[in-house]
């Protein structure tokens, strides 16, 4: 039932109008399709992405023939073979975009062959909840020019009983922020992920977000909490070892730790992602010691879903949370190993989209299967709401099993 009979690779468009890789896998009784997303703010240690057209052309002769006849339900075997064919430690041979599309499509085909959803195929009987949505409301940094310095101002409905209600609340915060900007006479377009990208300072963004959260929390009757993705590697100047802000402020690594800790206290942030340079394990650790008891200190560029880097972070005490992006590491098995390592050491995990997304909903299934605390996949835009709507459906199925 799960033996691979045919594989198709094609180029499709992502949400930024760029070409990416989509894979289709057909088994005797199953079908799976998956697409590779792409990032704008990428860590220097991420798995290598190749030009989609060239990668697909090479894969036709170098990859696909080796996968025909393999058992798609043997995920470890599939992913080990992808590594073997590639022959590098970062998928620079076949391309991480080809690898992740094939790996996920294989898993979906195996699930389809046994007539169960992907989240159940991977998570089995242990799945009893869905991750809460971590939504991007105001954006800047690499996602939008002439906007905020920090890349993302986020919200998460920490007080909602059902994830469905949290998804709707995030959308209401998004709309309320627009209304507050309009009231102030501030025009705002949208960034790559659908967040508002107004020409305002970071302090003003914090104030507007706090006001919107208060209004929507009162309306919904449950708590909504703020967070940020600082994407601090983009602020860091390697030559001087300092963080340089657009307003002329220059902060040392120690000052950056103090600044972020003060923001956590001032605005009751419950989630801070990439607050320091992606090689600064000690700086992360200092912030984690200072604020990790009241806030998730999350590494994205620091860890890039890589077990070696996560282990390094564990040895330093650098963070209490790991962002998980399957395309950063290349396969479902590698993704699972990263999550397992983090959880074994008491760290939370957050499954995440990329700025360049497709309508693929796989991460909604992975977030449930691996019991991640949050799913970071935007608030609006078809490629974002596809995942959120799938999460609503999955949550219904989980409740039906209870």
From Swiss-Prot:
<dbReference type="InterPro" id="IPR020811">
    <property type="entry name" value="Enolase_N"/>
</dbReference>
<protein>
    <recommendedName>
        <fullName>Enolase 3</fullName>
        <ecNumber>4.2.1.11</ecNumber>
    </recommendedName>
</protein>
<dbReference type="GO" id="GO:0005576">
    <property type="term" value="C:extracellular region"/>
</dbReference>
<dbReference type="GO" id="GO:0000015">
    <property type="term" value="C:phosphopyruvate hydratase complex"/>
</dbReference>
<dbReference type="InterPro" id="IPR036849">
    <property type="entry name" value="Enolase-like_C_sf"/>
</dbReference>
<keyword id="KW-0963">Cytoplasm</keyword>
<dbReference type="Pfam" id="PF03952">
    <property type="entry name" value="Enolase_N"/>
</dbReference>
<keyword id="KW-0479">Metal-binding</keyword>
<feature type="binding site">
    <location>
        <position position="229"/>
    </location>
    <ligand>
        <name>Mg(2+)</name>
    </ligand>
</feature>
<feature type="active site" description="Proton acceptor">
    <location>
        <position position="325"/>
    </location>
</feature>
<feature type="active site" description="Proton donor">
    <location>
        <position position="193"/>
    </location>
</feature>
<comment type="function">
    <text>Catalyzes the reversible conversion of 2-phosphoglycerate (2-PG) into phosphoenolpyruvate (PEP). It is essential for the degradation of carbohydrates via glycolysis.</text>
</comment>
<feature type="binding site">
    <location>
        <position position="273"/>
    </location>
    <ligand>
        <name>Mg(2+)</name>
    </ligand>
</feature>
<feature type="binding site">
    <location>
        <position position="376"/>
    </location>
    <ligand>
        <name>(2R)-2-phosphoglycerate</name>
    </ligand>
</feature>
<dbReference type="InterPro" id="IPR029017">
    <property type="entry name" value="Enolase-like_N"/>
</dbReference>
<feature type="binding site">
    <location>
        <position position="354"/>
    </location>
    <ligand>
        <name>(2R)-2-phosphoglycerate</name>
    </ligand>
</feature>
<dbReference type="GO" id="GO:0004634">
    <property type="term" value="F:phosphopyruvate hydratase activity"/>
</dbReference>
<comment type="similarity">
    <text>Belongs to the enolase family.</text>
</comment>
<dbReference type="InterPro" id="IPR020810">
    <property type="entry name" value="Enolase_C"/>
</dbReference>
<dbReference type="GO" id="GO:0009986">
    <property type="term" value="C:cell surface"/>
</dbReference>
<dbReference type="InterPro" id="IPR020809">
    <property type="entry name" value="Enolase_CS"/>
</dbReference>
<dbReference type="InterPro" id="IPR000941">
    <property type="entry name" value="Enolase"/>
</dbReference>
<keyword id="KW-0456">Lyase</keyword>
<feature type="binding site">
    <location>
        <position position="325"/>
    </location>
    <ligand>
        <name>(2R)-2-phosphoglycerate</name>
    </ligand>
</feature>
<feature type="binding site">
    <location>
        <position position="300"/>
    </location>
    <ligand>
        <name>Mg(2+)</name>
    </ligand>
</feature>
<keyword id="KW-0964">Secreted</keyword>
<dbReference type="Pfam" id="PF00113">
    <property type="entry name" value="Enolase_C"/>
</dbReference>
<comment type="pathway">
    <text>Carbohydrate degradation; glycolysis; pyruvate from D-glyceraldehyde 3-phosphate: step 4/5.</text>
</comment>
<keyword id="KW-0460">Magnesium</keyword>
<keyword id="KW-0324">Glycolysis</keyword>
<feature type="binding site">
    <location>
        <position position="355"/>
    </location>
    <ligand>
        <name>(2R)-2-phosphoglycerate</name>
    </ligand>
</feature>
<dbReference type="GO" id="GO:0006096">
    <property type="term" value="P:glycolytic process"/>
</dbReference>
<feature type="binding site">
    <location>
        <position position="151"/>
    </location>
    <ligand>
        <name>(2R)-2-phosphoglycerate</name>
    </ligand>
</feature>
<dbReference type="GO" id="GO:0000287">
    <property type="term" value="F:magnesium ion binding"/>
</dbReference>
């Amino acid at each position: 039932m799960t033996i691979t009979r045919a594989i198709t690779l094609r180029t499709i468009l992502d949400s930024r109008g760029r070409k990416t890789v989509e894979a289709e896998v057909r088994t005797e009784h199953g079908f799976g399709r998956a697409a590779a997303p792409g990032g704008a703010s990428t860590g220097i240690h991420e798995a290598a992405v190749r030009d989609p057209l060239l990668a697909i052309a090479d894969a036709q002769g170098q990859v696909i023939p080796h996968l025909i006849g393999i058992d798609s339900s043997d995920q470890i075997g599939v992913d080990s073979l992808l590594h073997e064919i590639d022959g590098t430690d970062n998928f620079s041979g076949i391309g991480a975009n080809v690898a992740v599309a094939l790996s996920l499509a294989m898993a979906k085909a195996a699930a389809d062959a046994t007539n169960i959803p992907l989240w159940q195929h991977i998570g089995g009987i242990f799945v009893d909840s869905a991750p809460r949505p971590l939504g991007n409301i105001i954006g800047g940094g690499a996602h939008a020019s002439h906007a905020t310095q920090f890349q993302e101002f986020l919200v998460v409905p920490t007080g909602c009983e059902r994830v469905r209600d949290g998804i709707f609340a995030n959308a209401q915060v998004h709309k309320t922020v627009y209304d507050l900007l309009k009231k102030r006479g501030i025009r705002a377009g949208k960034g790559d992920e659908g967040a508002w990208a107004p020409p305002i300072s970071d302090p003003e963004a914090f104030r507007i977000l706090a006001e919107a959260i208060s209004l929507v929390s009162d309306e919904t009757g449950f708590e909504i909490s703020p967070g940020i993705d600082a994407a601090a590697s983009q602020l860091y100047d390697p030559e001087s070892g300092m963080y340089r802000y657009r307003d002329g402020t220059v902060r040392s690594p120690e000052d950056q730790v103090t600044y972020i800790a003060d923001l956590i206290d001032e605005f009751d942030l419950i989630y801070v992602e990439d607050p320091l340079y992606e090689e600064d394990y000690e700086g992360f650790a200092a912030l984690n010691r200072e604020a990790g008891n009241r806030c998730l200190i999350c590494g994205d560029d620091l860890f890039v879903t890589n077990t070696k880097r996560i282990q390094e972070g564990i040895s330093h005490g650098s963070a209490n949370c790991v962002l998980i992006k399957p395309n950063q590491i290349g396969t479902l098995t590698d993704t699972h190993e990263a999550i397992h390592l983090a959880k074994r050491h008491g760290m939370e995990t957050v499954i995440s989209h990329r700025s360049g997304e497709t309508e693929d909903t796989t991460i909604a299934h992975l977030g449930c299967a691996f019991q991640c605390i949050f799913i970071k996949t935007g608030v609006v835009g078809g490629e974002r709401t596809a995942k959120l709507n799938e999460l609503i459906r999955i949550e219904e199925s989980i409740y039906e099993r209870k």
